[in-house]
Amino acid sequence: MSVLVVGSVALDSVETPFGKADEVLGGSGTFFSASASHFTDVQLVGVVGSDYPIDKLRELEQRNVDLSGIEKMDGASFRWRGRYRHDLNSAETLETHLGVFSQFQPKIPESFASPDFLFLANIDPRLQLNVLKQVKRPRLVACDTMNFWIESRRPELLELLGHVDLVTLNDGEARQLTEKTNLVQAAKWIMQRGPKHVVIKKGENGAFLFRQDNIFFAPAYPLENVFDPTGAGDAFAGGFIGYLARTGDLSETGMRRAMIYGSAMGSFAVERFSIERLMTVTHEEIEQRVRDFKQLVAFNEEMPG
């Protein structure tokens, strides 16, 4: 089954304690697509400026990512420059130049208008709502958001919650959105407003899946070397949604497996700058990492009672 993603396509310049990279592929749509393409066909909708090195995106086409939804506009592309110190959970933004992204009005090609799965990446909730008006209702609609939209577009974000099946956000954003300090209470608050599933990400501490009264925790993979955490959350989402699209299994068991595949893809993303590692990782490496995750939490001790 296909996945449609609407998100940013950017150029990132990143500094970490382990090196730096200039003008490399970035953006939520880019990271999601690179990750999800390991599982299913992906349709990407975004915008780039006339200065964007479009040839760099061609590698994604070879991985079953349809780029015909990328709009090219006159002007500068979206650029972000950030720095991570030894706390890799938070980036210091040094520069943000929205360029043509500030004028982005997603136009869904007719060939993309009946997706099986839809991921509304981190963009203005007004645009996310507009996308929903342009497509036939997918089997599953997921969205991401961030603190900026929670502060500046709260009414629209709350409206969006009534139209999606799944929300992904980090723990700080969950607390900010719901004004609840407890994440279990925060997830219930969100589900009361429409979504059936809530994924709360905690960076290097893993992620929670909330579904009805069930809670599942996926640990983060313990890596010795982390080069660039910039796209980890979007790579997680790509693995998660991509796996669901490949299997079509939206049961509790299917969702839990998808969480592990998402965590696996997020762990690969941080091993190199940009989408470099996501483009080279093999099917066998992905499956081995999933097996490693299972080993992380497996134990054979019989439980009393």
Regions found by a protein language model. Name each.
Residues 11-23, 38-120, 132-138, 287-305:
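Conserved N-terminal subdomain of the carbohydrate kinase-like
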Residues 36, 170, 233:
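Short, conserved phosphate/pyrophosphate- and ester-handling motifs at nucleotide-, phospho-/glycolipid
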